[in-house]
């Protein structure tokens, strides 16, 4: 969880009051043994600039959770490559928020 908090700030410029574990699994089944853990972050506060390391290009886009699926579909239609895992993780986040 400490690594997730650190990465959230470094990559997005936001910190979270609460991190709720969602799921963990291999980054790429059969191709890698790297395991990723995902969290739902709530109680967000902007604490600095986003961007990650010097060799990373990160753009933070704020989209209400109710609009994320449509946003991703439109991004794909516009030629953006969206990792398919993102669609599943958005649904897990929606379900967790509904509980």
Predicted regions and their residues:
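Nudix hydrolase/Nudix homology domain
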Residues: 21, 29-32, 37, 55-99
